[in-house]
Amino acid sequence: MLSPKKVKYRKKQRGRLSGEAHKGNKISFGEYGLVSLDTYFITARQIEAARVAMTRRVKRGGKVWIRIFPDVPYTKKPAETRMGKGKGGVDHWNAPVKIGTVMFEMAGVPRELAEAAMMLASSKLPVKTTFVVRRDLR
């Protein structure tokens, strides 16, 4: 699963996501993309599940790019632990996704197959998504 190799600070305050994406909102590498229509923190496990679903659907054909990376730590205290005694340890890593963020890109497969694979991956994610095609291909 994806996680940062090294971080400046181990733990972080949660914060809140709002607004639309100004970076990472255009298709850069592939021909097709999966774009978020919601704002959410997506876990590394969800990203991996979507990637596996896509690659299995296209059966070794084409190339897939993951455009989001889980670099925000999510801490959690152990079960049945009393409050206090400091912040819990890092449980997993999240990727912040805003409205309009291109999460996955794909190239080298027919449009119908790419759309089917992206929709399958979309069902593994907690956000509403849409399938987009690079402008110069239309």
Curated annotation (Swiss-Prot):
GO terms for biological process: translation. It comes from the Bacteria. The keyword Acyltransferase does not apply. GO terms for molecular function: rRNA binding; structural constituent of ribosome; tRNA binding. One of its GO terms (cellular component) is cytosolic large ribosomal subunit. Disulfide bonds: none annotated. Residues 1-20 are annotated as: Disordered. Residues 1-15 have a biased composition (Basic residues). Keywords: Ribonucleoprotein, Ribosomal protein, RNA-binding, rRNA-binding, tRNA-binding. InterPro entries: Ribosomal_uL16, Ribosomal_uL16_bact-type, Ribosomal_uL16_CS, Ribosomal_uL16_dom, Ribosomal_uL16_sf. PANTHER family: 50S/60S RIBOSOMAL PROTEIN L16 (PTHR12220), LARGE RIBOSOMAL SUBUNIT PROTEIN UL16M (PTHR12220:SF13). Belongs to the universal ribosomal protein uL16 family. Part of the 50S ribosomal subunit. Binds 23S rRNA and is also seen to make contacts with the A and possibly P site tRNAs. This is Large ribosomal subunit protein uL16. It comes from Borrelia hermsii (strain HS1 / DAH).
